[in-house]
Amino acid sequence: RKMAAAAVNGAAGFSSSGPAATSGAVLQAATGMYEQLKGEWNRKSPNLSKCGEELGRLKLVLLELNFLPTTGTKLTKQQLILARDILEIGAQWSILRKDIPSFERYMAQLKCYYFDYKEQLPESAYMHQLLGLNLLFLLSQNRVAEFHTELERLPAKDIQTNVYIKHPVSLEQYLMEGSYNKVFLAKGNIPAESYAFFIDILLDTIRDEIAGCIEKAYEKILFTEATRILFFNTPKKMTDYAKKRGWVLGPNNYYSFASQQQKPEDTTIPSTELAKQVIEYARQLEMIV
């Protein structure tokens, strides 16, 4: 609390040994700090380290002034909007920093403003984008139950018509159908650039699942066929991925998996058939695309 007070006093021009600042002056100081953060964040290429420092100071101020709606304190509309705006920048900053735990923390706090205070505050321009990002985050982590819990909090109209919400909802449907080609195509139709981060994580997970099926169902696979099945658009990306999985390309341009095959007595017919069905489905995706 002393650190937060010092941050506010410094921004407001008060001495730490002087009289306590009025709530209005403290709010004004916090607003000034937010404007500094906003100015840096809105630059074409924001300094993420500087933004992180500003966010750290502002979080302390929010805690000191009880801006976060977790203390039972009655807050003014201006205070709530200021806190919400700061947290929204924090969530977006976390995506650029590729800091998933930070994004999850910011979203946990933001949901208080989006749901608990929705009748008291004007709707944020970033609300649907961030709620959609949160759905995509849960999907990328395979937290499907939580995905549906969060979805239940949203109006049916948003789920059906809002571009930010529809995107992760469609992705979840494609995954349930096994329509992996549609998931990969969805990357080219993201509603905001920030969605690419979690989609890439989701696509990597899908590739790993397909690659696991390839290893179980085939003794060898042609390089070009593997490239197509795994949805890579360049040979280099296929080569890099193969190295990551320990695949070795033979002189005949085949990847061999003999050493990774299960022993015949340990292989069950259902799992083998399922793997082959997945590969056969993937093989036909080129025609669909």
Curated annotation (Swiss-Prot):
Domain PCI: 101-270
InterPro entries for this protein: 26S_Psome_Rpn12, CSN8_PSD8_EIF3K, PCI_dom
This protein's UniProt keywords: Isopeptide bond, Phosphoprotein, Proteasome, Ubl conjugation
PROSITE patterns xrefs: PCI
GO biological process: proteasome-mediated ubiquitin-dependent protein catabolic process
Residue list for modification Phosphoserine: 45
GO CC annotation: cytosol; nucleus; proteasome accessory complex; proteasome regulatory particle, lid subcomplex
Record flagged with keyword Phosphoprotein: yes
Family annotation (Pfam families): CSN8_PSD8_EIF3K
Role description: Component of the 26S proteasome, a multiprotein complex involved in the ATP-dependent degradation of ubiquitinated proteins. This complex plays a key role in the maintenance of protein homeostasis by removing misfolded or damaged proteins, which could impair cellular functions, and by removing proteins whose functions are no longer required. Therefore, the proteasome participates in numerous cellular processes, including cell cycle progression, apoptosis, or DNA damage repair.
Protein family: Belongs to the proteasome subunit S14 family.
Assembly and interaction partners: Component of the 19S proteasome regulatory particle complex. The 26S proteasome consists of a 20S core particle (CP) and two 19S regulatory subunits (RP). The regulatory particle is made of a lid composed of 9 subunits including PSMD8, a base containing 6 ATPases and few additional components. Interacts with DDI2. Interacts with TASOR.
PANTHER family with a match to the protein in the record: 26S PROTEASOME NON-ATPASE REGULATORY SUBUNIT 8 (PTHR12387:SF0)
Protein's recorded name: 26S proteasome non-ATPase regulatory subunit 8
Protein source organism: Pongo abelii
